[in-house]
Amino acid sequence: MSLADSDHELVVEELGREPTPAEAALFENLWSEHCAYRSSRPLLSAFESEGEQVVIGPGDDAAVVALPTDGDDDVYITMGIESHNHPSYVDPFDGAATGVGGIVRDTLSMGAYPIALADSLYFGDFDREHSKYLFEGVVEGISHYGNCIGVPTVAGSVDFHDDYEGNPLVNVACVGLTDDERLVTAEAQEPGNKLVLVGNATGRDGLGGASFASEDLAEDAETEDRPAVQVGDPYAEKLLIEANEVLIEEGLIESARDLGAAGLGGASSELVAKGGLGAHIELDRVHQREPNMNALEILLAESQERMCYEVAPENVDRVAEIAEKYDLGCSVIGEVTEGNYVCTFEESEARSASDDSTDERSESGERETVVDVDAYFLGEGAPMNDLPADEPTQPERDLPEIDLETAFEAVLSSPNTASKRWVYRQYDHEVGVRTSVGPGDDAAIVAVREANQGLAISSGAAPNWTDTAPYEGARAIALENATNVAAKGATPLAAVDCLNGGNPEKPDVYGGFTGIVDGLADMCATLETPVVGGNVSLYNDSPSGPIPPTPTLALVGTKDGYEAPPLALEPGAGDLLLVGDRGLESGDVRLGGSEYLAQFDGSDRFPALPEDPQALIETVAAVANDESTLATHDVSHGGLAVSLAEMVTGEAGLEVDIPVPAGTEAGVAGALFHEQPGRVLIQTTDADGVREAFDGVAPVHSLGTPAEDGTLSITVGDLSIDADAAKIREYRSTIAAELG
């Protein structure tokens, strides 16, 4: 990828000369879609990002949100999300691992300590060997890196869809903990302060990673693009986490930026640009892993586990001492100035990682200025794209005729609805001793004892939904994540998004992408949940075609305390109620976007959503926290049949009778398998109290009383089906049975 002719002309006009090779490479990377959001930024104003609890919104390495506490001391969380899609196709292990490392360092940049990770993963058809190879490699990379650095992976999602075959998605979110006194931003503060590079030595790995992520994947990407993929070192990252903690605690950092896309050039120029300042950097002062690196390589390499700090001159020696204590490299590479962003290089003085990085030189030869540009123009000067978009249309109804037994087995055993225990058993989700509710439930709960709050975390998307109806499906994804946290008794606080799309230059693709942006923004605004940050990943396109528009949402909610009602039924107690099923109430059951139709090649319009989603979420959270509530479970992927099956255990079964409203064309399949979000199963000893709570908010249907025989018996109209807990486990073990 090279600088477009129109961009080149704009750069020449601004500089008054031809750019140097290093400048041209910087503009190529920082004006790429990956960094500049040239096709998506015009759409992102749709999101509401402000709120009473929002401290720092979009634009920094991570967002900062204050927890609602009664005490005098403010407790902040940070939220960030990133994609590492192209690298994870080329090298699934390192691509996914370095995605984890990058989002953790974004957390460090804000003066926060990382306390939880959530990953949302998307692959091609599970039956294909290549999809399984990517899946296994990505999960191994995430588990290896996350486990080694001691940050628990507590939530996430996994989806399989044909259109990810040539381009998987790896979206990783991180939550951190900080407070007002520790808070740091990526905005340079003062001319004369030093720029200090701390962490691993710089090599040649990851060169051109930002521009690589801004192009469609080619057929030979797995071999030809391997140099653009970084190699992670989680042990160095762990040391960096702990060193950063000391630096923050001692108040040594004025501002900070993680070295990610475009490496040192990206991090340092963005840091000073946000402060309206410039910098003078001596590239040969950077501690290097490989010999004879030139200026461009040092500037753009995306070697991992590195941080750029702004440090007051009197604190530089102490920063170097701390770096040495944690066996991390440390280079004083330059200083903040009031002028341009300037990088110089003296090849004969280039250092290796073993050189003393803080000593002043006794001699100075003639230096070459390789970059001399306005930092703000470099970071913000890229022109935005005005692209045509085709309005998506929803499919016509074409429902298959499948017997109930076949449909039940197929939907329960689909990799999309099957147990993901094979994935999360590889993650250490209890390290840090904050995890109260771990993976496998609707949402994770992480204890923030500093505020006596439970932090509920849900992350995911639904490619079948947004493939069917981008706008409506994205609205549903926001509601689904909110319902997940509400089912565990939490109230939504804030969210970050990762907006994944194909090649935006294709009008149908850009139309779908526009739909997911607007849909996600509209529902989050309705729920009064600010979207405080995020990431955009476009050009997820390959010879296999574009991916489905995929809006991953990582949403957090808060609750008093750390306990939550379980997902599993309590044997022989109370009543099981279904809350919020508009289809059963009205007879307008739609199967669009369902796993049922994906399994049997049908089509339909997407389901209608609740009329007052905010009231629904507030009421679900309140009921979940009531002492009469014994169990709760969100209903969505796979429909009611899957959610009921997930609640059954060897000790607790259920006999349910589901009425099919007269005139419902979707019939039995619609009742069991439609995927309207905003529905919750509630086991309670106070059924009348639940009905009263939801009066005027959502319909409530009684499904029966949990039994003690471990068998699920479902009657729908004139048809019935039975499956005991062992059979359900067998159906839902698809992934583990295949991968071991």
PLM feature spans:
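N-terminal amphipathic, basic-rich helices that act as targeting or association modules
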Residues: M1-A66
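Glycine-/charge-enriched secondary-structure boundary and capping motifs
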Residues: D5-A24, N167-P168, G260-V411, M523, ...
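Flexible loop/turn segments at secondary-structure boundaries
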Residues: E33-C35, N85-P87, F123-F126, F160-E165, ...
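Non-catalytic terminal/interface segments that mediate subunit docking, oligomerization
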Residues: C35, E48, V54-D94, T98, ...
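Generic recognition of flexible, low-complexity loop/linker segments
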Residues: G51, V104, D159-F160, R182-A186, ...
